[in-house]
Design a protein with these regions (language model features):
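Acidic (Asp/Glu)-rich catalytic clusters
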Residues: 36-47, 77-81, 132-135, 161
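Conserved, mostly hydrophobic/aromatic
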Residues: 22, 35, 48, 76, ...
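A cross-family glycoside hydrolase active-site/sugar-binding cleft signature
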Residues: 23-25, 49-51, 88-91, 120-122, ...
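Structured C-terminal cap/extension of enzyme domains
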Residues: 12-15, 19-23, 134, 154-261
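Alpha-helix-loop-beta-strand connector modules within alpha/beta enzyme cores
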Residues: 33-51, 105-114
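N-terminal binding-site loop/beta-alpha segment at the start of enzyme catalytic domains
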Residues: 1-46
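Short hydrophobic/aromatic-enriched beta-strand-loop microsegments
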Residues: 45-48, 137-145, 244-251
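Glycine/proline-rich, positively charged
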Residues: 1-2, 12, 16, 58-154, ...
Length: 261
Protein backbone atom coordinates (compact mmCIF):
# COMPACT_ATOMS: atom_id res chain seq x y z
CA UNK A 1 0.00 0.00 0.00
CA UNK A 2 0.84 3.67 -0.14
CA UNK A 3 2.67 5.06 2.88
CA UNK A 4 2.29 8.43 4.58
CA UNK A 5 5.89 9.25 3.58
CA UNK A 6 4.96 8.72 -0.08
CA UNK A 7 1.95 11.01 0.25
CA UNK A 8 3.98 13.68 2.03
CA UNK A 9 6.61 13.55 -0.72
CA UNK A 10 3.92 13.66 -3.41
CA UNK A 11 1.94 16.57 -1.97
CA UNK A 12 5.09 18.56 -1.15
CA UNK A 13 6.16 18.07 -4.77
CA UNK A 14 2.76 19.23 -6.04
CA UNK A 15 3.03 22.46 -4.06
CA UNK A 16 6.54 23.03 -5.40
CA UNK A 17 5.11 22.61 -8.91
CA UNK A 18 2.26 25.04 -8.25
CA UNK A 19 -0.35 22.28 -8.38
CA UNK A 20 -2.99 22.71 -5.69
CA UNK A 21 -6.03 20.73 -6.87
CA UNK A 22 -6.49 17.34 -5.17
CA UNK A 23 -9.18 14.89 -6.28
CA UNK A 24 -10.22 11.96 -4.11
CA UNK A 25 -13.42 10.14 -3.06
CA UNK A 26 -15.17 8.75 -0.01
CA UNK A 27 -14.84 5.23 -1.44
CA UNK A 28 -11.07 5.77 -1.82
CA UNK A 29 -10.95 5.40 1.96
CA UNK A 30 -7.18 5.15 2.39
CA UNK A 31 -6.60 8.12 0.08
CA UNK A 32 -8.69 10.48 2.20
CA UNK A 33 -7.11 9.24 5.41
CA UNK A 34 -3.57 9.82 4.16
CA UNK A 35 -4.45 13.23 2.75
CA UNK A 36 -5.95 14.16 6.11
CA UNK A 37 -2.83 13.05 7.99
CA UNK A 38 -0.74 15.24 5.70
CA UNK A 39 -2.90 18.35 5.65
CA UNK A 40 -2.99 19.45 9.27
CA UNK A 41 -3.04 23.25 9.18
CA UNK A 42 -2.02 23.28 5.49
CA UNK A 43 -5.50 22.67 4.07
CA UNK A 44 -5.68 26.27 2.88
CA UNK A 45 -2.86 25.58 0.44
CA UNK A 46 -4.97 23.12 -1.57
CA UNK A 47 -8.33 22.94 -3.28
CA UNK A 48 -9.81 19.66 -2.03
CA UNK A 49 -12.35 17.86 -4.21
CA UNK A 50 -13.97 14.58 -3.26
CA UNK A 51 -16.85 12.42 -4.45
CA UNK A 52 -19.82 11.04 -2.56
CA UNK A 53 -22.67 8.54 -2.77
CA UNK A 54 -20.89 5.49 -4.19
CA UNK A 55 -20.73 2.71 -1.60
CA UNK A 56 -17.47 0.77 -1.55
CA UNK A 57 -18.22 -2.91 -1.02
CA UNK A 58 -21.87 -2.22 -0.21
CA UNK A 59 -23.40 -2.01 3.24
CA UNK A 60 -27.00 -2.94 2.51
CA UNK A 61 -28.04 0.64 1.87
CA UNK A 62 -29.17 2.24 -1.35
CA UNK A 63 -26.44 4.19 -3.08
CA UNK A 64 -27.11 7.90 -3.56
CA UNK A 65 -29.83 8.06 -0.90
CA UNK A 66 -29.90 11.18 1.23
CA UNK A 67 -28.61 9.32 4.29
CA UNK A 68 -25.74 7.71 2.37
CA UNK A 69 -24.67 11.03 0.86
CA UNK A 70 -24.84 12.84 4.18
CA UNK A 71 -22.70 10.18 5.87
CA UNK A 72 -20.33 10.09 2.90
CA UNK A 73 -19.68 13.82 3.18
CA UNK A 74 -19.31 13.64 6.96
CA UNK A 75 -16.76 10.82 6.64
CA UNK A 76 -14.73 12.82 4.13
CA UNK A 77 -14.72 15.85 6.42
CA UNK A 78 -13.61 13.76 9.38
CA UNK A 79 -10.90 11.82 7.52
CA UNK A 80 -9.33 14.96 6.11
CA UNK A 81 -9.82 17.08 9.21
CA UNK A 82 -11.81 19.74 7.37
CA UNK A 83 -14.78 21.90 8.31
CA UNK A 84 -15.76 22.47 4.67
CA UNK A 85 -14.97 20.59 1.46
CA UNK A 86 -14.09 22.85 -1.47
CA UNK A 87 -15.84 20.73 -4.10
CA UNK A 88 -17.94 17.56 -3.84
CA UNK A 89 -19.07 15.54 -6.86
CA UNK A 90 -21.91 13.04 -6.94
CA UNK A 91 -19.98 9.90 -7.87
CA UNK A 92 -21.18 8.50 -11.23
CA UNK A 93 -24.86 8.07 -10.44
CA UNK A 94 -27.18 7.52 -13.41
CA UNK A 95 -29.39 10.05 -15.16
CA UNK A 96 -32.35 8.25 -13.60
CA UNK A 97 -30.97 8.83 -10.10
CA UNK A 98 -30.30 12.46 -10.95
CA UNK A 99 -33.86 12.96 -12.21
CA UNK A 100 -35.26 11.46 -9.00
CA UNK A 101 -33.74 14.45 -7.23
CA UNK A 102 -32.83 12.96 -3.85
CA UNK A 103 -29.08 12.74 -4.51
CA UNK A 104 -28.73 16.28 -5.82
CA UNK A 105 -30.95 17.61 -3.04
CA UNK A 106 -28.79 15.93 -0.39
CA UNK A 107 -25.66 17.50 -1.85
CA UNK A 108 -27.29 20.95 -1.98
CA UNK A 109 -28.38 20.57 1.65
CA UNK A 110 -24.77 19.87 2.60
CA UNK A 111 -23.74 23.01 0.73
CA UNK A 112 -26.39 25.08 2.49
CA UNK A 113 -25.21 23.66 5.82
CA UNK A 114 -21.69 24.95 5.13
CA UNK A 115 -20.12 21.51 4.69
CA UNK A 116 -19.53 21.95 0.96
CA UNK A 117 -18.44 25.05 -0.94
CA UNK A 118 -19.13 23.96 -4.52
CA UNK A 119 -21.10 21.04 -5.95
CA UNK A 120 -20.48 18.83 -8.95
CA UNK A 121 -21.28 15.65 -10.83
CA UNK A 122 -18.82 13.00 -12.01
CA UNK A 123 -19.97 10.88 -14.95
CA UNK A 124 -20.18 10.68 -18.71
CA UNK A 125 -22.41 10.89 -21.76
CA UNK A 126 -26.20 11.08 -21.17
CA UNK A 127 -25.70 11.11 -17.41
CA UNK A 128 -23.43 14.13 -17.63
CA UNK A 129 -25.88 15.89 -19.94
CA UNK A 130 -28.66 15.30 -17.42
CA UNK A 131 -26.52 16.77 -14.65
CA UNK A 132 -25.71 19.85 -16.70
CA UNK A 133 -29.35 20.36 -17.70
CA UNK A 134 -30.42 20.50 -14.05
CA UNK A 135 -28.62 23.81 -13.59
CA UNK A 136 -27.66 23.11 -9.96
CA UNK A 137 -24.04 21.95 -10.23
CA UNK A 138 -20.97 24.17 -10.31
CA UNK A 139 -18.75 21.64 -12.10
CA UNK A 140 -18.68 18.30 -13.85
CA UNK A 141 -15.98 15.65 -14.06
CA UNK A 142 -15.95 13.78 -17.39
CA UNK A 143 -13.75 11.42 -19.35
CA UNK A 144 -11.96 13.23 -22.17
CA UNK A 145 -8.76 12.11 -23.82
CA UNK A 146 -7.13 11.33 -27.11
CA UNK A 147 -8.69 7.83 -27.21
CA UNK A 148 -12.10 8.79 -25.83
CA UNK A 149 -13.55 11.97 -27.28
CA UNK A 150 -17.24 11.23 -26.74
CA UNK A 151 -17.62 14.36 -24.62
CA UNK A 152 -16.56 16.55 -27.52
CA UNK A 153 -19.84 16.75 -29.41
CA UNK A 154 -22.40 17.36 -26.67
CA UNK A 155 -21.11 17.31 -23.09
CA UNK A 156 -18.34 19.90 -23.40
CA UNK A 157 -20.46 22.36 -25.44
CA UNK A 158 -23.31 21.97 -22.93
CA UNK A 159 -20.94 22.65 -20.02
CA UNK A 160 -19.59 25.69 -21.81
CA UNK A 161 -23.10 27.05 -22.39
CA UNK A 162 -23.93 26.44 -18.73
CA UNK A 163 -20.80 28.25 -17.61
CA UNK A 164 -19.67 25.48 -15.26
CA UNK A 165 -16.21 24.10 -14.55
CA UNK A 166 -15.02 20.94 -16.29
CA UNK A 167 -12.52 18.55 -14.73
CA UNK A 168 -11.17 16.01 -17.23
CA UNK A 169 -10.63 12.51 -15.88
CA UNK A 170 -8.41 9.91 -17.57
CA UNK A 171 -6.58 12.64 -19.54
CA UNK A 172 -3.70 10.31 -20.40
CA UNK A 173 -6.10 7.54 -21.49
CA UNK A 174 -5.29 5.43 -18.43
CA UNK A 175 -1.71 5.29 -19.81
CA UNK A 176 -3.01 2.81 -22.41
CA UNK A 177 -0.90 4.45 -25.10
CA UNK A 178 2.18 2.84 -23.57
CA UNK A 179 3.37 -0.70 -24.33
CA UNK A 180 2.34 -3.44 -23.79
CA UNK A 181 -1.24 -2.17 -23.99
CA UNK A 182 -3.07 -2.44 -27.28
CA UNK A 183 -6.54 -1.83 -28.76
CA UNK A 184 -8.30 -4.60 -26.89
CA UNK A 185 -7.58 -2.83 -23.60
CA UNK A 186 -8.72 0.70 -24.40
CA UNK A 187 -9.75 2.73 -27.40
CA UNK A 188 -10.81 -0.15 -29.63
CA UNK A 189 -10.38 0.43 -33.38
CA UNK A 190 -9.44 4.07 -32.70
CA UNK A 191 -6.08 3.08 -31.16
CA UNK A 192 -4.20 2.18 -34.36
CA UNK A 193 -5.19 5.29 -36.37
CA UNK A 194 -4.18 7.53 -33.45
CA UNK A 195 -0.81 5.79 -33.09
CA UNK A 196 -0.22 6.03 -36.85
CA UNK A 197 -1.10 9.73 -36.97
CA UNK A 198 1.04 10.63 -33.95
CA UNK A 199 3.96 8.65 -35.38
CA UNK A 200 3.67 10.48 -38.72
CA UNK A 201 3.58 13.82 -36.88
CA UNK A 202 6.62 12.94 -34.76
CA UNK A 203 4.54 13.01 -31.58
CA UNK A 204 4.81 9.33 -30.63
CA UNK A 205 8.08 9.77 -28.69
CA UNK A 206 5.98 10.68 -25.64
CA UNK A 207 2.37 9.64 -26.29
CA UNK A 208 1.35 10.52 -22.73
CA UNK A 209 2.47 14.09 -23.27
CA UNK A 210 0.53 14.25 -26.51
CA UNK A 211 -2.60 12.88 -24.84
CA UNK A 212 -2.38 15.31 -21.92
CA UNK A 213 -1.77 18.25 -24.22
CA UNK A 214 -4.74 17.12 -26.32
CA UNK A 215 -7.03 17.15 -23.29
CA UNK A 216 -5.80 20.50 -22.01
CA UNK A 217 -6.14 22.06 -25.46
CA UNK A 218 -9.92 22.24 -25.15
CA UNK A 219 -10.87 25.71 -23.85
CA UNK A 220 -13.63 24.36 -21.61
CA UNK A 221 -11.31 22.11 -19.58
CA UNK A 222 -10.64 23.72 -16.20
CA UNK A 223 -8.36 21.02 -14.83
CA UNK A 224 -7.20 17.48 -15.59
CA UNK A 225 -6.68 14.81 -12.94
CA UNK A 226 -4.11 12.00 -13.08
CA UNK A 227 -4.04 9.41 -10.34
CA UNK A 228 -0.62 8.74 -8.82
CA UNK A 229 1.16 8.19 -5.53
CA UNK A 230 4.54 8.70 -7.18
CA UNK A 231 6.15 12.14 -6.88
CA UNK A 232 8.40 11.50 -9.90
CA UNK A 233 5.40 10.66 -12.08
CA UNK A 234 3.68 13.83 -10.85
CA UNK A 235 6.68 15.94 -11.83
CA UNK A 236 6.86 14.27 -15.24
CA UNK A 237 3.17 14.89 -15.88
CA UNK A 238 3.44 18.51 -14.74
CA UNK A 239 6.22 18.98 -17.29
CA UNK A 240 4.05 17.37 -19.96
CA UNK A 241 1.13 19.67 -19.11
CA UNK A 242 3.32 22.74 -19.60
CA UNK A 243 4.55 21.70 -23.03
CA UNK A 244 3.58 23.63 -26.15
CA UNK A 245 -0.01 23.30 -27.28
CA UNK A 246 -0.75 20.83 -30.04
CA UNK A 247 -1.00 22.47 -33.43
CA UNK A 248 -4.51 23.26 -34.70
CA UNK A 249 -3.76 20.99 -37.67
CA UNK A 250 -2.97 17.99 -35.44
CA UNK A 251 -5.93 18.67 -33.16
CA UNK A 252 -8.26 18.79 -36.15
CA UNK A 253 -6.83 15.54 -37.51
CA UNK A 254 -7.29 13.82 -34.14
CA UNK A 255 -10.87 15.08 -33.87
CA UNK A 256 -11.65 13.72 -37.33
CA UNK A 257 -10.35 10.27 -36.37
CA UNK A 258 -12.90 9.71 -33.64
CA UNK A 259 -15.39 6.94 -34.38
CA UNK A 260 -18.86 7.77 -35.60
CA UNK A 261 -21.60 6.91 -33.08
Amino acid sequence: GVSLDQIENLLDSLLDLGITFIDTADCYTRSEELIGRYLGDRSGEFVIATKCGCISGGDGEEEYSRAVIERSIDRSLKRMGLECLDLVFLHTCSAEVLRAGEAADALMRARDAGKVRYTGYSGDDADALQAISMGVFDAIQVTFNILNQTALDEVLPAAQCAGIGVVAKRPIANARLLPPDSPQFYGGPYWDPVRSLLTDEGAWDDPLECSLRFTLSHPVITSAIIGTANALHARENAKRARAEALSPKLLDALHKLRPED
